[in-house]
């Protein structure tokens, strides 16, 4: 199995968080998976892509910053209380707590130091701009859209196991774009497929019986769920939204799905799943990707 970095260089994008006037820095694996499903449908290769996606070896992570190298999510639950210097005064403790709270992503080379108690400032990878748009012929025709504008040296990447089909779909997707308001020109990107640095690839795993961090917003299969919740340190994220039916020309609300956010840490790996979240009586499956790839924590 060959993992690759799929590096995407955007100019502007709208990665929504529920409203037009907000935008995130990155996106979860289910978003790019949905985009790949639509891309494969346009190319007449949906069945082939779904057959590949349902194989155990298929892998897809959330998107993370790439700035002179890969960044990873902050490991949730670290550093442990006993790893923090207890000799500092109260003001310094508060300052360190604020640093840790603001931190979203860590450069790969800083992850182990963070696990062992060293704190880092949050890197600025992008700014969120607000753009005013016009909708002619509609009441209240002015509206605002938040966009993520990346710094010149920042891209986003996902990790996936390389295949000819995935390469073809990702190459096509760079022109279709990712995220919202694509008709306004947001979300297109330049794609670069690179080998994964050895110091990262050596710690990627799907089956490990010691401490790990999920690189994918994921949901365990039922048999693994209870143990993951008991032994893990995690944040839950809600996946919701609407699905469009061409048969009725209407939007229907998808089933809500709660998953472990990337950066969640566990005592061992678990098996994930692809969940059908179609609305009641919807004519076809609506798939939500929740199969994790893990990073070994060496603490």
UniProtKB/Swiss-Prot annotation:
Keywords: Antiviral defense, RNA-binding. It comes from the Bacteria. Signal peptide: none annotated. One of its GO terms (biological process) is defense response to virus. InterPro entries: Csm4, Csm4_C, RAMP_III_fam. The keyword RNA-binding applies. One of its GO terms (molecular function) is RNA binding. The keyword RNA-binding applies. Pfam families: Csm4_C (PF17953), RAMPs (PF03787). Encoded in a type III-A CRISPR locus. Part of the Csm effector complex that includes at least Cas10(1), Csm2(3), Csm3(5), Csm4(1), Csm5(1) and mature crRNA. The Csm complex is elongated and slightly twisted with a maximal length of 215 Angstroms and a diameter of 75-80 Angstroms. It has been modeled to have a central protein filamant of Csm3 subunits along which the dsRNA helix of paired crRNA and target RNA binds. The filament is capped at one end by Cas10 and Csm4 and at the other end by Csm5; ssDNA is thought to bind to the N-terminal HD domain of Cas10. CRISPR (clustered regularly interspaced short palindromic repeat) is an adaptive immune system that provides protection against mobile genetic elements (viruses, transposable elements and conjugative plasmids). CRISPR clusters contain spacers, sequences complementary to antecedent mobile elements, and target invading nucleic acids. CRISPR clusters are transcribed and processed into CRISPR RNA (crRNA). Csm functions as a non-specific ssDNase. Base-pairing between crRNA and target RNA to form a ternary Csm complex activates a ssDNase activity; target RNA cleavage suppresses the ssDNase, a temporal control that prevents uncontrolled DNA degradation. Viral RNA transcripts probably tether the Csm complex to the viral genome, recruiting Cas10 ssDNA activity which is able to degrade DNA in the transcription bubble, spatially controlling the DNase activity. Belongs to the CRISPR-associated Csm4 family. This is CRISPR system Cms protein Csm4. It comes from Streptococcus thermophilus.
